[in-house]
Amino acid sequence: MYLFIRDAIDHIVIIKPTTVKNIVLCTYMFSLFSVLLKKAARFPATIAAPTPRSRRIIVKSSANGSFITYIMIMNMFKTSEVIEIFLNYDISKSKDESKYEISELEGITNTSFVVSVDNKKFVLRIPGNNPDVINRLSEKHNSTKALEYGLTIPYLIFDENTGIKISRYFDIYTYKASDFKNENMRNNAFNVLNKLHNSDLVFQNNFSPLRIFQEIADTSNSIENEAKEVGFKIVKKLNEIGISNHPCHQDLYSGNFILYNDETYLIDWEYSSMGDKYFDFADLFWQNEFDFDKNLRKEALDEIGISKKDEIEKFEIFEILSMITWGLWALKRSPNDNDGQVALSKAIKLCKDKKL
């Protein structure tokens, strides 16, 4: 039995409304796949079979401009692999697939599952292909420190060699970007960040937005190369302004804020490190589209105490750095990612507007 997991959608254009009821991938042999699209019309599809090394499937389909064009990348996991992980870490002794219920959780970098077995529920994280970017030993250290300080929820297993993490399943509410429009929820998020930044925690250095763009930019790509040059200008300007050193989370998209027992916590500390708290706030604003609402943006800046001209300048420069960081990261994962290209284009334009 296989679990087919959507990893990314590179491109989607809907010309007319259409309903895709489901996509079923069937295996006849390990290297042969077919796709059945159950919808109003049938479109031709091609599938690149996964290699044993990557175990990835690329599905491409087009409707000759009449309905929908998409490119989908899917990861393939055997159910038996999930079970093997649970056996290896002594979470369960059951080898019977019928005893397991496994469902996918939405994620960006990693693949995560809710796994039910032995009348218990767990969350299993299987890391993505990013060993060159994330130091799992540092992530474990920083997660443990954050847990001790009451900033996150506990885990059962964290293997720093593989990046596999297993936690008990908690009945939580996961923030959406729209939740930051709610003043109470927004301030709860700010409070947990302030608690982190004002703590005496010392994180191990792991992921630095001041350097990562240099490592992941594909200089053969013109927009990535230009974004890299903008990154150097940003770092030069920030060094002139002054960079502080605080424990930071550094990946503040909405899904990393959760509510549990009426308290707000942060999860997923894989990019955490010592850094400047302005990057955390700038990253939070950009990843959750605060710039779409000028009133919300101004209110939120006042709430985090950023109001002076020099403070706003530093904040906005860190916002550009956030765009470059995650724009390049999106293109590293998927070279045709439209959001990544938009983020880099915006960062380049803002840099020119500021004459950095």
Which stretches of residues belong to each language-model region?
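Low-acidity, Ser/Thr- and Arg-rich intrinsically disordered low-complexity segments
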Residues: Y2, R6, K16, N22, ...
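Conserved N-terminal boundary motif of the eukaryotic protein kinase catalytic domain
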Residues: D96-S103
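All-alpha amphipathic helical-bundle segments outside canonical DNA-binding/catalytic cores
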Residues: K309-E319
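Amphipathic, Lys/Arg-enriched alpha-helical patches that create a basic surface
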Residues: L344-L356
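Active-site activation/catalytic loop segments of kinase-like enzymes and analogous catalytic loops
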Residues: F279-S307, I320-N338, S345-I348
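An alpha-helical support segment within catalytic cores of ATP-dependent transferases
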Residues: F77-D96, L201-Q250, S254-Y260, C351
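ATP-binding pocket architecture of kinase catalytic cores
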Residues: S103-Q204
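Active-site acidic catalytic loop and adjacent metal/ATP-binding pocket
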Residues: E106-N119, V123-L124, V235-F279
